[in-house]
Amino acid sequence: MKQVEIIGYSRANLGKKGSKDLRLDSNVPCVLYGGESQLHFHVPMFLFRDIIYTGVACTVLLNLEGKQYKCVVQEVQFHPINEMLLHVDFLLLDDKKQVKMNIPVKFEGTSPGVIKGGKLVQKVATLQVKAFPKDLPDVILADISQLELAKSVKVGDIKTNNYTILNAKSIPVCTVTIPRSLKQEEAAAAKK
């Protein structure tokens, strides 16, 4: 799993006003959970570019005023209108404890249904996984090489390696839909 290093700075003002002032200075208020006590800090907003806005999951090496913590992003809060990053929660990793994390889904292979004119529709962007930190994948690969028209790949169809997917097995990850034009062609052929 990819590891990204970011630098954080402790913060004393924990209220609404302190958080608002940090955001005005292009900083994001953050909290690190999982240790003996919670650590409140802030990180410059541009440092989250390599963590949140990528298509792969990663661990974070947090440098907090000289001390280093290995952690993962647990929760991210965005502003509902302008989608500005408001708050980030980190979870401290322990090699002896399993951790839950949302991992992005990618597709491998070429679907015969897409070749026949269908459209591949992704239903789920991430899946929740439980694993030891060393076994966390960057992405979850879903094989679509056998996916025909009007069929779907479900969570239960995905092969896992040293991790458990916590989502329900019956949830579709992707589906090959039949476009309207293809349905009309089939209906016209059936009438003849």
Swiss-Prot record:
An example Gene Ontology biological process? translation
Specify whether Ion transport is a keyword of the entry.
no
Q: Name the family the entry cites.
A: Belongs to the bacterial ribosomal protein bL25 family. CTC subfamily.
Q: What is the lineage of its organism?
A: Bacteria, Pseudomonadati, Bacteroidota, Cytophagia, Cytophagales
Record-linked NCBIfam families: bL25_bact_ctc, PRK05618.2-2
As one GO molecular function, the record gives:
structural constituent of ribosome
Please name the Gene3D superfamilies in this protein's record: Ribosomal protein L25, beta domain (2.170.120.20), Ribosomal Protein L25, Chain P (2.40.240.10)
**Described function:** This is one of the proteins that binds to the 5S RNA in the ribosome where it forms part of the central protuberance.
Could you tell me what this protein is called?
Answer: Large ribosomal subunit protein bL25
Assembly description: Part of the 50S ribosomal subunit; part of the 5S rRNA/L5/L18/L25 subcomplex. Contacts the 5S rRNA. Binds to the 5S rRNA independently of L5 and L18.
A cellular component annotation (GO) from this entry? cytosolic large ribosomal subunit
Tell me which domain of life the UniProt entry assigns to the organism this sequence originates from.
Bacteria
